[in-house]
Amino acid sequence: MALYRRGTASMDADGTVHGTDTKWKDQLALIRVGATIVFLEQPIKLAVISDIVSDTELKAISTDGQTAADGKYVILLNDSLTVNGLAQNVAETLRYYQSKETEIASALDIIADLDMDNLNNIVQEIKSNKSAAEAAQNQAELARDSANSARDESISIKNQTQQISDSAIGSINAAKDKAITNVQQKENSAVTHINSEEAAAIQAINDAKGDLSGYVNDAQTAAQTATSAKNDAQAARDAAVSAKDAAAVSAQEAQDAANSVNADNLLTKDGNLSGLADKEQSKKNLAVNRLNQPRGDLTEIYSNDDRTGFKLIVKDSGDWGAMTHDGSENKALGVNFGGTGGTTEEQARTSLKVYKLDRTNLGEKHLDSITGEGDGPGIYMQSSSALATASRGYPEATAGMLEVLPNGANGASACIQRFTPFTYLGTAPESGNSQNEYARAGRGTFYIRMKNGNNAKFSPWIPFQASSSGNVVSSPASNEKSSWVDYVNALSSQPSSLASYNVNSVGWVTAISVRHRNGQGDGSAFGFVIEDASMTSPHYKDVRLRKQTGAGQWQSTQVIWNTGNTTVDSNGFIKRASPIVDIFGNGSHRTNDESEGCTVERISTGEYLIRGCLSLNSDLAWGGVNGGIEIPKDINGQPILWVDYDVNPDGSLVIKTYHRTHDNAPSFARNHKDGYSDGDPIDIPSDVFVSVRVEMPNDSIYNKKVEECKRNHERMVSGEFVESLKNT
């Protein structure tokens, strides 16, 4: 039969199927391994039978952990969804009952062989055997009667002989013994004969009894066998009739099922499920309704059963994506799933935080229209200098590249624009061939402007330029200058810059050059420069200012006074500094960079010993040849000490201080002090100090630093320093 649905069934998550009132092992059930069991619940669940354990237990595969509650079910015994499968089931059922009909026929043949005539013959034979036994018994009884007669006859003869003997005693005494002997012999012979006959009769009777017993037993056994055979035959006949009836019923059911099949309603293998009346409902029943193929090159998978949510599409071309069920809106694949997070280029760039690289020309677009908002940020190209006009927001009429970077200042439109013009610089240095001209940022120029989110306008373009070498810091080869004239002419011919120059007559000079209008137009005649003429030295003595007038002439350089090349004396005045030692009353001291290494010791009242120097340094600003000591003064500008000094043979200095009065001054300005007269030795007052300008030896700490800087610079120029760093 095509379907089996007896009883109810349930299924565990491990694939075990339990049945109630089922007969799954029954051969007539036609259940085989590989058959499909369908649980009739919502949604329908399917499983494939892998083992038939018992009438009430099956094992199933392909369950995916599904369970089914106890309820109605149906087992598809074969490919019952097709005519071929149904025919196979009907044929198998008929074959089963045909095999049973053979057994029934055999049983009927046995019954035919055991008909009543044969049974009667067997009974008559048994009865005949019984009559023969009874006849044998009668013969034995006759033999016994004959023996008895012989014995009686012998007795009669004996009696007769006795009578003869008695009658002839008197007349035949001589023959008495012989007669007795004869009689005795006859008697013995008779007795022997009688005994023999009696024994034979008894043996015959016993034999007859044994034969009769065997015949009786055989007859009883045969009767029992016949009865059993009859019973078996009757049972076989009944079973055959029952089986025949059941076969007829099953055959009728199969025929009815076959007759009830409408070929138009059957699914055929060749039809590939095309005959389903309601394909959509069938998909739901089989839990595949979320899969759809509206055309040959497109496959869709929906997010829910009623197809009202979203769907995933895949085309044969390889295109795929997610969208609403009706296709009205595409859905982006999130960044967390490996997507861009957007369905447009703008959304994707926003989600991934990247900027647009648009290699199409800006054309006639105004640069003010490209802001930090929306799809504005990115990199743009302008290939036409003719279109790069001021009316379109360009800083100069040159083709170039525009970079737009959002900065979020007070709104989404806030951004920074940077425009880099393209300029042909001529022949590529490595080729010398005019055909190998190449474009790069001309003269290191680029422009920047900004826009605030709450302001509709951009700021003016701000130009940025470097030296003619294209770098903010120049290389020795490009900025080698033969003289100061060559150096200042280079400053005049280039835009504002930060650079260093190797002036042959001086050494390395660092310069910050600010050009009027960035050197354009009349900007070549006006400029201002801050320079360090002793770049490789560890001091600030040669930090200078230069200025160019409108006529293009450079003015004399002006030294910038600073804490590195000046000192403040005890009276608060600035003086040009070299090695300076400040001495305090208690013997403590203070040095600057150049006097580092000097020490001071108070050796007595008003006497201080300075070691580590080579006497005083003569400088007109410090009093000429005999100068070099700055004396503290009062508020009226009058010295409050007398100072003297001695130079020791090793160059160390002894500074001596004495009390100093001004007797001709008003009383408040005479500097009188109790216990001290004018010229008495006295310590330096605690609120002032004496500054001494000293001469330092060549091996002083400062001079060693200067020499080390010079050597390092020479090593850097020669490349030795870089190589030493590589080897460390």
Curated annotation (Swiss-Prot):
CDD domains: pyocin_knob. GO terms for cellular component: virus tail, fiber. Keywords: Host-virus interaction, Viral attachment to host adhesion receptor, Viral attachment to host cell, Viral tail fiber protein, Viral tail protein, Virion, Virus entry into host cell. It is found in: Virion. Disulfide bonds: none annotated. One of its GO terms (biological process) is symbiont entry into host cell. Coiled coil: none annotated. It comes from the Viruses. Probable tail fiber protein. This is Probable tail fiber protein. The lineage of its organism: Viruses, Duplodnaviria, Heunggongvirae, Uroviricota, Caudoviricetes.
